[in-house]
């Protein structure tokens, strides 16, 4: 009975989170709903909330792969063409390549950390799934507005 009750409570919290995220993301103009990440981690979020994934610094599904110089040049061009205001990087990964792309782009591009590979320590933003998603939502909204 307790497990069933806790499952219902958590399901309700997830539904409230989804509603809140949708409302927050709706505050971003459609032409600014463009994502560039350090690797492909936001595809489901993009599909669910109406974002376009412009590209990823590491073009494969693993962080062990290294992008080629032509991959990076193509991504810089895509960032400039789409006028992407932010590159979202995992808070637990180095942001060196994102910084290089930001500096090479002929537009202002900020680097915004997200929680995607792991949760943060207890008591900090991103320490639970719900907190992680709230924190990421705030970061995405602030990065794209």
Regions found by a protein language model. Give the residues of each.
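Extracytoplasmic metal-acquisition and chelation regions
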Residues: 1-145
């Amino acid at each position: 009975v307790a497990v069933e009750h806790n499952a219902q409570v958590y399901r309700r919290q997830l539904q409230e989170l989804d509603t809140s995220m949708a409302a927050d993301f709706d505050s971003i103009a459609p032409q600014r709903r463009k994502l560039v990440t350090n690797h492909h981690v936001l595809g489901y979020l993009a599909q669910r909330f109406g974002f376009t994934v412009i590209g990823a610094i590491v073009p494969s599904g693993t962080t062990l792969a290294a992008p080629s110089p032509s991959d990076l040049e193509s991504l810089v061009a895509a960032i400039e063409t789409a006028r992407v205001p932010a590159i979202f990087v995992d808070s637990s990964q180095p942001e060196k390549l994102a910084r290089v792309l930001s500096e090479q782009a002929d537009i202002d591009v900020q680097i915004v950390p997200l929680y995607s590979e792991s949760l943060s320590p207890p008591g900090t933003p991103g320490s639970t799934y719900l907190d992680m998603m709230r924190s990421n939502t705030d970061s995405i909204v602030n990065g794209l507005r």
